Structure formats: C-alpha cells, structure tokens
Amino acid sequence: MNFSDIKKIPFFKNHIFEHVIETGSTNDNIKAKTKKSDFIHCLQLADFQTAGRGQYNRKWVSEKSGESLMFSFSAELPCDSFPASLIGGIAMSGALRGLSVNCKNLWLKWPNDLWYKNGKLGGILTESSIIDGKILCVIGIGINISAINDKSLNTSCVNEFAPEITKEILLKAFCEEWDKIIYYDSVALSKLWRD
C-alpha cells in the first residue's frame, strides 16, 4: 500500500502509516502506541485481523479469501466534539457516495454501522480517553469490499454496487472526507448523518 497521497491530507500529515499483513486488532495496536511517552499519531491498515471486534466486543469476521478494508487511526478531538464513531460513519458514507453513483441504498444504522440494502457493509469502533482536556480517540473501521464466504452472516459488500472500488481507493477517499468534515459543527454533522 502506498500512503503517499494520504500523507498529503492535512489531518493525516503528522501521522505515521503502517501496513501489516496480519495482526490481532489494529485498534489494540494503536491503543498500545498511545500509551507510550513518545507517541506519534498513527494509521494502521491490516490485510487480516485475527481478533478484530466491533461494538460490545462483537467479533469482526474477516477472511483471508475475502477482501476487507480494515484500519485504525488515532485522532485528538475537542471535548465538545461530535461523537467520533458518527463522524467516521458520515465520512465513510460520504467517501462511498463520492466514488459511486449507485449508493442510493447505502445507509447509516445507529450508532456505528454502515448498511447497503439489508446487509451490513461495515462498522466503526471508537475507543476514547481524555488526556489534557482533549479526547484521544482510536477509530477502527472495517468495510467489506468483496463478499465473505460465511453466508450465515447478514452482510453486503462494496463490490455489489461499485466493483471498481478497491480498498486503496476507499481508504484515500475516506481520509479526504474525514479531513473535510472533522471540524464541522454539530448541526452540520447531524444533517449529514440524517441525509
């Protein structure tokens, strides 16, 4: 993965970027980094997670045979900020809508899921702590790019409506959208969430 275009996006210009083939959980990896005294903001992308999870510690199913976009990043937000998981959902929805005109059946499910038609497309897990009057968030995102083999799960995938979108294209579009909306006020973000 080439992160050179993402490094130019203002919000992410001071982040370090890592691409790992396999890991337990990108959220856990970023959280561990935030505890170090020489902490530098980071975005970590994984091809496969063995211990990925969602809200309420629900297991995030990823397959080596199916392609998913799985990444986590750190962000400092003001204490009065709109919830980061909602901003993440709005940014991912905006990124997908910007890449494909076939997104009319894409919707956000409270509080942290993206759905396409009647299947879960992905989710956002945010873990936060307050440090020096700011919220330090670790935002983890998992999006199904292609279909997963477990048919017992009610899932959908990006390739159902936009087969041209790869995880590299979607990651860049998400980062651009996050950078665009992160400092919107709550009224503007609420409107985007409802739309």
Predicted regions and their residues:
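Long, positively charged amphipathic alpha-helical accessory segments at protein N-termini or as interdomain linkers
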Residues: 78-105, 116-195
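N-terminal lobe of the biotin/lipoate ligase/transferase fold
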Residues: 1-101
